[in-house]
Amino acid sequence: MSQALQQIFNQANTTNFVVSIPHSNTTSAFTLNAQSVPIPGIRIPVTDTVTGPFGLGRAQRPGVTFEYDPLIVRFIVDEELKSWIGMYEWMLGTSNYLTGENTAQKTGPEYITLYILDNSKTEIVMSINFYKPWVSDLSEVEFSYTEDSDPALVCTATIPYTYFQVEKDGKIIAEV
């Protein structure tokens, strides 16, 4: 079988990831309980320019900036709510509505890393570092007596960031 065909059948699995927030005791429970995280969407915005001999046409050209969707992480809320409290404290460290302090991004971690693992979950295939992250949104956490079983409580954190860098084989992918 050719190598191209082997690569087609060797698909990645949705569970091949680890979210890491280095040097952050506040968010350790969140990191351990991360359940799902997509690689955020990125785009180059379209710039409309005039075209045609009389300037009556419109051409779409690539813009000169990148736009990033936020990092969305769904996590399990543990029995003592440490994972939720850690994220709430991170939010308060960014903009504290109780004290009026607004430290912006000074108190949070420098970056978050999303590690994509191979199918054996022993080797890192790719890393994405999200720089200057901050929590903008925590979803609701619903308690309910109407469930037949005892499902896990989940919460979703929306984490904007300034930019990200993709690392593959020890090198930052910066240009083609």
Swiss-Prot record:
Kindly state which keywords UniProt assigns to this record, in alphabetical order.
Answer: Late protein, Viral tail protein, Virion
GO cellular component annotations of the record: virus tail
Does the keyword Ligase belong to this entry? no
Q: InterPro entries recorded for this chain?
A: Phage_T4_Gp19
Please list the GO terms describing molecular function.
Answer: structural molecule activity
Q: Where in the cell is it found?
A: Virion
The answer to whether keyword Oxidoreductase applies is no
The function of this protein is:
Plays an essential role in tail assembly by capping the rapidly polymerizing tail once it has reached its requisite length and serving as the interaction surface for the completion protein.
> Oligomeric state and partners?
Homohexamer. Interacts with completion protein gp15.
Instruction: Give the protein's recorded name.
Output: Tail tube terminator protein
Q: Which gene encodes it?
A: 3
